[in-house]
Amino acid sequence: MPVCNNDSQLIGLGVSVTLADDTTVNGTVYTYNSSEGLLVLFQGFSGSNPNVKIIRTPFIKEVTALRDNEEKLPPQLEAKARLPSMQAARDRSLFKHASSQLRNAKDKRNQLLQTDDQKTPIAALDTLIKLERIYPDIHWDKDAGVIRFNQDVVVKGKPDWTSPAVVIAEGAGDISRSLMERVQKTLSKK
């Protein structure tokens, strides 16, 4: 492909391109980028869709300019022409994304609250939901009847779940102590 002073000089020119395998492709140059090594040919419309060929310039053997090319580029937009709004598609995409996020949150909440034990107090589940918003990796340990953060830190109802308290295992490290303090602050907020 010859290098032009300006890549835009070729745009709109009718050409016949012979490829390295001796196949011929005709069309109007839609765009040419010598630095990227790309030539895009416009070949008219099939139905309402444009027919475009993208060719890598290393595979071009020969380019011949055509005098009266029947295929021309579509006309440019007028200065005051307005493109169709993309807002409808954007709204649909946002709605789809929001619906997906909501469905995932509901599934996660259902999984979090799934317990076969009918004796689980409602106040314990309320505390679990409150803490799960901040600490998403916690879970309900139905065998011990506690909310478990890790092996060292749990939340128990003392004496019942209307006043939950954070309990730390003996010999726990500084990280667990720090977590205990943060959880206690979270529980003290209403």
UniProtKB/Swiss-Prot annotation:
The keyword Transit peptide does not apply. GO terms for molecular function: RNA binding. Residues 84-190 form the AD domain. The keyword Glycoprotein does not apply. One of its GO terms (biological process) is post-transcriptional regulation of gene expression. Forms a complex composed of at least MKT1, PBP1, XAC1 and LSM12. Forms a complex composed of at least MKT1L, PBP1, XAC1 and LSM12. Within the complex, interacts with PBP1; the interaction is direct. Involved in post-transcriptional regulation of gene expression. Belongs to the LSM12 family. This is PBP1-interacting protein LSM12. It comes from Trypanosoma brucei brucei (strain 927/4 GUTat10.1).
